[in-house]
Amino acid sequence: MYDLLKTIDDPADLRRLDRRQLQPLADELRAFVLDSVSKTGGHLSSNLGTVELTIALHYVFNTPNDRIVWDVGHQTYPHKILTGRRDQMHSLRQYDGISGFPRRSESEYDTFGTAHSSTSISAALGMAIGSQLNGDDRFSIAVIGDGAMTAGMAFEAMNNAGVSEDAKLLVILNDNDMSISPPVGALNRHLARLMSGRFYAAARAGVERVLSVAPPVLELARKLEEHAKGMVVPATLFEEFGFNYIGPIDGHDLDSLIPTLQNIRELRGPQFLHVVTKKGQGYKLAEADPVLYHGPGKFNPAEGIKPSTTPAKKTYTQVFGEWLCDEAERDTRVVGITPAMREGSGMVEFEKRFKDRYYDVGIAEQHAVTFAGGLATEGLKPVVAIYSTFLQRAYDQLIHDVALQNLPVVFAIDRAGLVGADGATHAGAYDLAFMRCIPNMTIMAASDENECRQMLHTALQQPNPTAVRYPRGAGTGVATVKEFTEIPLGKGEVRRRTSQPEGKRVAILAFGTMVAPSLAAAEELDATVANMRFVKPVDAALVRELAETHDYLVTVEEGCVMGGAGSACVEALMESGVIRPVLQLGLPDQFVDHGDHAKLLAQCGLDGAGIAKSIRERFLSPAADVAGHAKRVA
């Protein structure tokens, strides 16, 4: 099994193969990807769809001298396997294993780290211009999906690239008509019309030579969705940007891909190759439902993904989705917005029930936030469902377009804190720090499912921009209460009181997901625990009361320590005039790698045992140094 694949330790081995061996290699590679992902979990549909394209690129171009940048990066498993990491695939996305995304520190073939979308053309253009300036003769290639092409950054890069007439730049549009959620908007409709223009590529002067080696475009067009008879295809958007447009060609046909790429290799200036692929190619279950198989956990390939037979705890994403539907039923002003994450953000049911108030704006976080601001000015109640890591992309809009005008937009921030197997690129580590400094913002962190629901309801009642952060995955098992209860603004609650005598009293000020492990640590240490709830406005009265009745204060958050929730507590303490030693616990001043979420928390000292250990070493051991006012541990 895998007789050909076992001979490939790097692309140089691939380039030594006879052309006739490449399709059998593709079959082995696809089977290997399926087998690997079924054992580790990970992205599947997208990787099954890029097998032939990956082989063709490494076969034609002299990698790593020629640079390949993979947009988003979750479709790079075939690339990793062909570039020396075949025998490490069992560790994919595991603790201390290889990353699920390109990483420069992992391989010289990973020329640019990616994970967020629409960055590849900018990076590849920079490489192409850099190579020119250095006098190097190499191609720089960006592989970008049709979903990622809806983001403005991709077109900013193309606008810049189009005037670089001598750059050896190739942009490959991997057109599978499928981002995580179906691509939306006028641009996608334009691409669909372009793709369905049956005689377009053959008729274009200057492209006939490149395409002459490929099967007739007419044959490919029969596989594509046809539009109304007699439709006139508009001039391509890509040529208007100064690119030489080539295609579309079948992205699963090596006899089309390889000679086309060989011809492109001889050209100069920006080239744009349009390839049509199918997500899940070669595995019928994934072909039929590429969303379900986009990022599965472990499963049996022979049986496919089966529903769990054991009752699962409700996820925070499900809590949000149910809350949004309930609020929309009560109030016709509620509008839901997602930047291309309908399934991931829990908005499938909302779209079905409230289609006229559901807006998927595509991979356009900046637009999503300002669009929400515009809705708010008209008296509507916009709710932006967004991952913490993607809100970073709309920071200026958050400040300039929403907070500065004090517009009542609700930000439902999913995937806050560490995110496990997706790693540092997707971690929600910074939202508390970067939002806390913005005037007019209210920020809450949920400690359980019902508190999340009630916080979201509270946020919807506020006259200013308000954020509720909650983590990825299942909650604590707390049942949600159907009736809504508004949480008093800026008020935390004490969940446990110490019985220790004076001189040993420790108060733990916990935020969001850190309430549960803090309670576990408190049981061991007999400490007080406060569920702070609000990061802004922080409960200054509670901070003062705890400082006055305890000897030591500890803040705990699943976010970066620098500038985060703990810093808000220290600032409140300084304002109170009460001096107490403070220990701040949170994520370290470094990027936390991928792996099991529980293991990563333990690594950061943020599980119950780690919190107790830090407190004991800092305050309660005979050698403890409690001099000074505050100390950060991360």
Curated annotation (Swiss-Prot):
> Which UniProt keywords are present, listed alphabetically?
Isoprene biosynthesis, Magnesium, Metal-binding, Thiamine biosynthesis, Thiamine pyrophosphate, Transferase
According to its UniProt record, this protein's enzyme class is: transferase
Q: Which HAMAP family match?
A: DXP_synth
The Swiss-Prot or TrEMBL record annotates one GO molecular function as:
1-deoxy-D-xylulose-5-phosphate synthase activity
Q: Which residues bind thiamine diphosphate?
A: 74, 115-117, 147-148, 176, 283, 365
This protein's cofactor list reads: Mg(2+); thiamine diphosphate
Family annotation (SMART domains): Transket_pyr
Secretion signal span: none
Give, as in the UniProt entry, the pathway in which the protein acts.
Metabolic intermediate biosynthesis; 1-deoxy-D-xylulose 5-phosphate biosynthesis; 1-deoxy-D-xylulose 5-phosphate from D-glyceraldehyde 3-phosphate and pyruvate: step 1/1
Record's InterPro entries? Dxylulose-5-P_synthase (IPR005477), THDP-binding (IPR029061), Transketo_C/PFOR_II (IPR009014), Transketolase-like_Pyr-bd (IPR005475), Transketolase_BS (IPR020826), Transketolase_C (IPR033248), Transketolase_CS (IPR049557)
Q: Which reaction does it catalyse?
A: D-glyceraldehyde 3-phosphate + pyruvate + H(+) = 1-deoxy-D-xylulose 5-phosphate + CO2
| Source organism of the structure | Burkholderia orbicola (strain MC0-3)
Task: Tell me the subunit arrangement.
Answer: Homodimer.
Q: Name one Pfam family in it.
A: Transketolase_C
Function per UniProt: Catalyzes the acyloin condensation reaction between C atoms 2 and 3 of pyruvate and glyceraldehyde 3-phosphate to yield 1-deoxy-D-xylulose-5-phosphate (DXP).
This protein's superkingdom?
Bacteria
Please identify the protein, giving its name as recorded. Answer: 1-deoxy-D-xylulose-5-phosphate synthase
